[in-house]
């Protein structure tokens, strides 16, 4: 969808909200833009906004909300995520809605390619202005590692998303960038605000102990030469002190996967073989 596409809130978009569910109070009949709905979803974790995004984008594509959810599952598998199944757009508990840290990290890695995502999540405060179709709504970024001056601020963090349900407990996905190294950290089933220092410690460990090594120019095998012809086609994170030449490659190609995911699996195989 386009950022200025209208998002209309039907009864289905709001009727499921229960006391304690994250919401900014959008109501049936409200009309905002897709951009405003994304800000409400990504900053304030507004469950009704997340539902409305799926319902309206699905409708505009000639389908419905359930079709949009199914596309989420399709896209996850395209990225190499094989241990997830999404049953809704907001993450509220459903026995058929599950994921894992690895799949969330794959999605987080993909988000680095979408600057519009970072424009939204790096916003600290946002207001949906009052209009004929909606009351004024003000909300803020819940990811405390993105707040300069805050006790949990992490200067290398560039984006992310918080999450909580009584079943899943606290979850957090965070993207960080230091120099030319980009990392994604996923922490799940954590209690309270421990999720922020836990994430920071994991990032600090990774930045301190691993280095980004391009595969192109280092891999000399003719079997993968064509795949790695593009110098930007891939890299591997190596423990500092380990040379690329120390690795022993094992190539396994799954033809059902897209080329990007195939390359990722090949690179991971090199590291795992060495370890």
Question: Model-derived features: where do they sit?
Answer:
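Domain-terminus/edge residues, biased toward the C-terminal soluble/receptor-binding domains
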Residues: 81-82, 96-98, 102-275
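Active-site-adjacent loops and short helices of periplasmic peptidoglycan-processing enzymes
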Residues: 1-102, 111-114
């Amino acid at each position: 969808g386009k950022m200025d596409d209208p998002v209309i809130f039907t009864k289905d978009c709001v009727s499921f909200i229960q006391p304690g569910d994250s919401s900014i109070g959008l109501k049936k009949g409200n009309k905002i833009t897709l951009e405003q709905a994304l800000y409400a979803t990504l900053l304030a974790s507004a469950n009704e906004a997340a539902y409305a995004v799926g319902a309206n984008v699905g409708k505009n594509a000639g389908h419905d909300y359930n079709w949009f959810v199914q596309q989420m599952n399709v896209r996850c598998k395209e990225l190499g995520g094989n241990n997830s199944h999404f049953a809704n757009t907001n993450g509220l508990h459903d026995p058929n809605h599950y994921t894992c840290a690895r799949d969330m990290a794959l999605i987080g890695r993909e988000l680095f390619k979408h600057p519009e995502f970072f424009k939204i999540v790096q916003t600290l405060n946002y207001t949906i202005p009052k209009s004929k179709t909606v009351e004024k709504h003000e909300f803020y970024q819940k990811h405390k590692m993105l707040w300069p001056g805050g006790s949990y601020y992490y200067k290398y963090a560039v984006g992310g998303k918080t999450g909580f349900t009584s079943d899943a407990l606290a979850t957090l996905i965070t993207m960080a960038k230091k120099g030319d190294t980009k990392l994604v950290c996923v922490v799940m089933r954590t209690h309270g605000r421990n999720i922020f220092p836990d994430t920071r410690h994991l990032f600090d460990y990774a930045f301190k102990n691993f280095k980004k090594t391009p595969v192109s120019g280092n891999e000399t095998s003719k079997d993968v030469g064509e795949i790695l012809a593009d110098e930007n086609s891939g890299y591997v994170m190596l423990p500092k002190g380990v040379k690329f030449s120390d690795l022993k490659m094992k190539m396994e190609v799954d033809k059902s996967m897209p080329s990007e995911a195939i390359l990722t699996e090949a690179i991971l195989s090199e590291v795992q073989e060495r370890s």
